[in-house]
Amino acid sequence: MKTRTINFKNKSSVFWKYFTENTTDTRCMRNTANFYIRNTMTGIRKSPEERTALETEVLHDVFTGIQKANREAEERFLSKLERLVKSGGMKSAVRRSRLVQTVFSYPTKDKWFLNYETLDAIFKETNHPVYRRMNSQVNQNAIRKTVKSWVGYFESMKEYVVCPEKFLGKPKLPGYIRTQQATAWWTKQTARLTFQAGKAYLQFVNLKEMFCIGKESQYRGLKYIKTEIKPFHGQFRILITLDDHMKEPKLPEDPKRILGIDPGLDNLLTVAGNFGKAPFLIRGGVVKSINQRFNKRRAKLIASLTRGYDSSHSHKDSHALDALSRKREDALRDIFYKCAWYLVRYAKVHKVEVIVIGYNPLQKQEISMGKQNNQSFMSIPFQKLREIVRMIANREGIPIVMQDESYTSKASCLDQDPVPDYKKGEVPPEFSGKRTRRGLYRSANGILINADVNGAANIIRKRYPDAFKGQRMDYLYRTTETVNVQDWYLPYRERRNLRKHTCSKISRIRHGDGSERRADLMKAFGCTRKVWTPVKTAA
């Protein structure tokens, strides 16, 4: 699958109104479906006297809608059966034997959950205003998302009862969407992909105008799947999902050329391989600077918005906050894509067979790097970076492996220390080397190696223990190259100081001729509005 992203910010366009209406109605539809499920859950278990007014109203709509839907389903079934009986023949007899009547079951105390088909029938038969004013299938997709969240909640609860240590806490009921808009979803029946005059367009349902999404060559040979309109910090982000018929590359059984990646803070990515090339670091100072500026500016804006109000319940939304968040996400996204393409090109040049990326399952919850480092580390979306690297590497035919990086920074890769998995309650093993100071690791022989390079090599060894077998490892500590993100951008051009500009010879001649011509006109016709003459003042 391939997803193409387009940002849309033209508020004067007809598409802005269309996207706003559909995303707002999607939020209302999802909250309405959630409201019906929650009130059915609580109201069906109570007696009629104990139910609240909302529970009574919801249950009335539920039972009325199911009753009408069953009556219409029975009428359709009987009419089809009558047509098949009249037609006669062997074919109609076979179809008649396979004909099944649709019956919606009423909720009970034990089976109270309303699935997608039941909710759709209830809203349709009761003529719910939100359901009726929305475009076809967009409202149904909103109901599907709500039901899917409830199904995920039930599955999580079953797993939580069996193995609660897998979770950080007890799963909670699906809540309501607090924002004003939610992501709307169009299938290929309600948003068609068309081509005209070398351009690609999306034709949305109930809209005459076509939305241009780029050149025709960008979409030829791809199968269109769906379109999502996502509210994005005061704008809209259009996500077009396409099937590029590409399969995820198979993982080799015994790879010879492996690349290990250790994500970090000061060094955004540390890359080391087992094929004799010097490791390199992609510096993370730019990402830290972006986050630092974002956090400071955001704190000032929120302080100005909540001044004089309770900060925990006040409204924290403004155009400045939207623009600040949007610029930060766009900047990080651009840097992550550049890092990913740099890594993949490096891997293709050196014929890498597999890339191993380290990760910590609970790095956001249980990190302990100090107050300042914790704030910087938690605000960097490392999972998004890993997914971008995976997507681009798979597109180029290089498989990606995620490896738990516990104890990779403590074990010595030069001494071939075993790298175990972390288990709560177990005593950690003793390792040959240790970290002497910031950024350096000393092995048992006294050799100093970059600490992040040592971690990247151990990530490879943890996945493939024999990756460095029979190889000299001196290339890991002899030279460590550094890559700065700033080098991937064009240099800043200073503005020319216009005050230092001197006229050329031709300009002076041209202006001189003009002044002489104006003087001749003044002699011939006298003073005019277009000719300046000094005002004589009395002595």
Pin down the residues of each PLM region.
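Short amphipathic alpha-helical segments
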Residues: 18, 22-25, 134, 138-145, ...
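Positively charged, helix-rich recognition surfaces that bind polyanionic ligands
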Residues: 234-539
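Short amphipathic alpha-helical coiled-coil/interface segments
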Residues: 26, 142-150, 321-328
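Long, compositionally biased intrinsically disordered regions
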Residues: 1-135, 306-318, 437, 476-477, ...
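A generic secondary-structure signal for well-formed alpha-helical elements
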Residues: 30-37, 41, 150-157, 267, ...
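Generic detection of short hydrophobic beta-strand segments and adjacent strand-loop junctions
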Residues: 4-10, 209-215, 280-282
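Stable alpha-helical structural segments in soluble proteins, enriched in small hydrophobic residues
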Residues: 33, 141-153, 453-463
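Acidic carboxylate diad motif detector
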Residues: 59-232, 375, 379
